[in-house]
Design a protein with these regions (language model features):
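Juxtamembrane intracellular "pre-TM" segments in multi-pass secondary transporters
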Residues: 148-186
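Glycine-rich segments within core transmembrane alpha-helices of 12-TM secondary carriers
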Residues: 19, 93-115
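Hydrophobic core of transmembrane alpha-helices in multi-pass small-molecule transporters
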Residues: 45, 49, 56-75
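Helix-loop junctions on the cytosolic side of multi-pass membrane transporters
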Residues: 85, 138-156
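Cytoplasmic helix-loop-helix junction between adjacent transmembrane helices
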Residues: 64-102
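Symmetry-related core transmembrane helices of the 12-TM Major Facilitator Superfamily/SLC fold
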Residues: 124-143
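Structural signature of the two symmetry-related core transmembrane helices
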Residues: 36-52
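Central cavity-lining transmembrane alpha-helices of secondary-active solute carriers
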Residues: 7-27
Length: 199
């Protein structure tokens, strides 16, 4: 059951959660000096939730979708932050562009595969296949990407979280020094959402 508007509301809810928590998550990973552990956690949570999409009725499915999409979008924060680790200043633009292009290609291939398999395994089966492929294609990043930096903050989780909040506040105050930055970030949110909707 359900309709497109229900999916839209669920998507908005998950993106609002990302919007609220993303700066804190980014600051937390910066203070820890590590991204892979956070990426592993968000990816595994997303995979786990995706497996159960479509099971248990409409409302549970929407709630699970909110959680899965939140974990996926949060994982992108840590994934994107790995770019300096896998590139140099000279080739960073090329590496980043190549990664984005391959990602969009993967989306097209995934959609094509979904069209071919949907009739035989159904929507619920497609969610399970998507979860499996997401996990499989994430493993090389977990295994082969080696971060150079060590943890910069060895205190308790509570202290790390408090420090991240303080760092976030300082960063937000500094945005006043760059008038165009806030407009760019807000525009980026709507641009990225439109692109994701298109693909």
């Amino acid at each position: 059951g359900g309709n497109d508007s229900m999916y839209g509301y669920a998507n908005i809810a998950s993106m609002l959660l990302v919007l609220i928590t993303a700066p804190m998550l980014g600051a937390l990973s910066d203070r820890s000096g590590r991204r892979i552990p956070f990426l592993v956690i968000t990816t595994c949570c997303c995979v786990f939730l995706t497996v159960f999409l479509g099971v248990g009725g409409l409302f549970p499915a929407l709630v699970i979708f909110v959680g899965a999409n939140y974990m996926f979008q949060s994982g992108l924060i840590f994934y994107d932050a790995l770019l300096p680790t896998v590139s140099t200043e000279r080739n960073r633009g090329k590496i980043g562009s190549f990664g984005v292009g391959v990602g969009y290609l993967g989306s097209l291939l995934g959609a094509t595969m979904g069209i071919l398999l949907l009739g035989s395994i159904g929507h619920i089966g497609m969610f399970k296949v998507s979860a499996l492929l997401f996990l499989v294609f994430s493993i090389p990043c977990f295994v082969f990407v080696k971060e150079n930096g060590s943890s910069k903050y060895l205190g308790s989780r509570l202290k790390a979280l408090r420090g991240s909040v303080n760092q976030l506040i300082k960063t937000l105050r500094k945005t006043r020094e760059y008038p165009g930055l806030s407009r760019f970030l807000i525009g980026r949110i709507f641009y990225a959402d439109a692109v994701n909707t298109l693909i």
